[in-house]
Amino acid sequence: MSQTPFQRFPSRCIARRDAVKIIAGASAAIALSPSMALADSIEEDAQADQTLMNSWRYDQGELIEDEATEEDGISTYGSGSAFGKDAEGNWCNSQGNPIPGALLRGVDVSEHQGVIDWRTVKNSGSIDYAIIRCGFGSNYSNQDDKQFFNNVRGCLDNGIPFGIYLYSYACSTSMARSEAQHVLRLLDKAGLSPLSLNYPVYLDLEQQDKSGKPSGINDKGQSIALSNSALADITAAFCSTVEAIGYAAGVYANTNWWTNFLTGSTYNKWSKWVAQYNTVCTYSGIYDMWQASSKAQVPGIGGNVDINFDFLGIGGNHVWSRIFGQDQLDTMRSIAQTGWSSSSTVVVATQNTYWDALTASALAGIHDCPILLTSSSSLSTQTKSIISQLGATTAYVVGGPIAIASAVDEQIKNTGCGKVIRVYGDDQQGTARAIAEQVVNAAAPDTCIIATSWKFQDALSVAPYAYWKKAPIYLCDDGSNKLSAETEKAIKAGGYKSAIIVGGPIAVDSGVEARLENCGIPSVKRIYGETEYETSAAIADWETKCGMSVNKMALATGNTYYDALAGGALCGRNGSVLVIEKNSNRTAITNFIAPRKSEISSGYVFGGPIAVSSESWLTLLRTQTGRI
């Protein structure tokens, strides 16, 4: 995934106890500096104190071990519960009964555990992930967790996937944003980025007043009661701040809080971590991780530690994994590295427009090679490195010197790729025809594809089929959405037996069917839906009927084209489909993936959480695991 060694295409999701984790094409050009500049400005006003922690877990900053009550939704385990696996490989509770749906087991840790021997933890095989406390309250250095950096380094050095949590004192949205900046400051200081975390950044909500109701601590150290709406606003302020930088966000609370105070459906767009020390979690709402006990024993960790179960496989890539990088070109490189260890040929297209890369899908299919993106003026660093890594000796550059400068040809040769072939026409339709001619001469395909040139979504969805079937894509003219005389002539010369039109009559003129029949094509089929997102699902459904698979399929954003341009080639090579989504239209997940989830043993999400949001990622994982 362009990602950390642990997480593949991160996902983020979980929170924590003591106080209280998938970029690209727009993939996620993550501009760290503006927000980090804020995070670096440590507040020096009034500061809270760890002794102000009061909750079902803390009494004036001290951990409470045995005094939880049933009213809190907590029933404590006996000391030393094992939580191991049974003979069938199922995670079990303290009574040895399987925990339905539990995929991964982890711990959450803070300075309360002292210095942890992470190598011993790793070698014990006791856990799959860790959630690390970074601190508590607003952005003050004396509220940093004393073991945060040691714990991060221990996880990094030993390949343990991890996420972050912060114990909240916030009683206002401004304080919540300060708490988010507290997290961001420490992540930046630790040298971490959204690519580093396998799990989300969690807000730990448990601070309460003497009556047991939710509260915050103001800058005078006073306890302030919080209404349900205030809690929702505080949570949104914190989560939106960390999400703006590209991190996934989550919320931690016990069942009492989730049932009575954190009740709105808006919380479902973040990873939900539920604490209930019981043999089962009885919370009836959606949740992704369960904190089952505070009394587990793990080799390498002195004393008791919280044990948690991940039901989505967020850090373990159980089915879906993200492929992404710091920006769209990093994502493109990661996609190429995922699909190819070597390739004698590459196709290079500009990242500045989508037509050339899309219509090059069949050409890439002919040569079983990746599609690489570059800037127009010079060869991108990422494409340069991947050409060298793959050992390519031939590069097809699609697009003329306006699309990609002539100097790029020589830059490609300097990578060791000695043969550069330019394929282009006078405009995007002409380049599509030139590419199609190459494909026809090499493979004599029996099918061609017709798409609009004024938007990219329809052709994105059919690109894997074009690669797999080696079916050329022809573009309609701008404005009219009709086929030009030159394109009709090229189609007729292709000798196709069938043609596929992607998009409705607004995208591709209703008269195009007749024009294709006049070109001698006996079978013409149009595929479309109400919007481009329904069209995407319809195309994928049709592709499966043609023999393509949903296993190893991919999901990408429909807001931009970068990730799917490169990803379409990977899907085509795998013989799998690609669907697109956006936050306001997840038809691809709900209508296409959901009924086919049993057929999917692995799948990809192209792009990080700025491209395919954390909410969409959670919806996908919850759909796959039946937890929605």
Describe the predicted segments one by one.
Residues R105-D108, D128-R133, P161-L166, Y199-L205, ...:
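Structural recognition of the beta-strand scaffold that forms the well-ordered cores
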Residues P194-Y283:
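Catalytic domains of cell-wall/extracellular-matrix polysaccharide-remodeling enzymes
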Residues S41-Q113, S124, S265-V319:
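Functionally critical loop-and-helix segments that line ligand-binding/catalytic clefts
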